[in-house]
Amino acid sequence: MGGCVGKGRRHIEEDKLDFKGGNVHVITSKEDWDRKIEEANKDGKIVVANFSASWCGPCRVIAPIYAEMSKTYPQLMFLTIDVDDLMDFSSSWDIRATPTFFFIKNEKQVDKLVGANKPELEKKVQALADGS
């Protein structure tokens, strides 16, 4: 499964991606991001950041899988950022397609995955969890 490219159309609030049942922190501001990154550093956690969009089909497919991973790997911190809600912030990460996953340790990117590739996401998350 691939990713969505380009700036999408906005949907109403109820169209937000569903991460229920997981331990995914929804980032709604740069301040939220800074707080969570600081918390992860303090706790020695690796961050998995999912840049996604509510209108993106592959993002909708991977959302419940991402939520499940957040429960399976509590030693990691799972964040999600809606690229339409935080356009400037997302642009600073050079997001070209959604979903894009960044893996961050000690405030530095250690890996990246573009697209809703479940096996590859699971492999990367597992490797980071094993090494944390």
UniProtKB/Swiss-Prot annotation:
UniProt xrefs under InterPro entries: Thioredoxin-like_sf (IPR036249), Thioredoxin_CS (IPR017937), Thioredoxin_domain (IPR013766), Thioredoxin_H-type-like (IPR050620)
Segments forming a coiled coil: none
Disulfide bonds: C56-C59
Gene3D superfamilies reported for this sequence: Glutaredoxin
Start and end residues of each Thioredoxin domain: 18-130
Residues at the active site: C56, C59
Alphabetical list of PROSITE patterns matching this protein: THIOREDOXIN_1 (PS00194), THIOREDOXIN_2 (PS51352)
Similarity comment: family membership: Belongs to the thioredoxin family. Plant H-type subfamily.
Record-given protein name: Thioredoxin H4-2
Species per Swiss-Prot/TrEMBL record: Oryza sativa subsp. japonica (Rice)
Taxonomic placement: Eukaryota, Viridiplantae, Streptophyta, Embryophyta, Tracheophyta
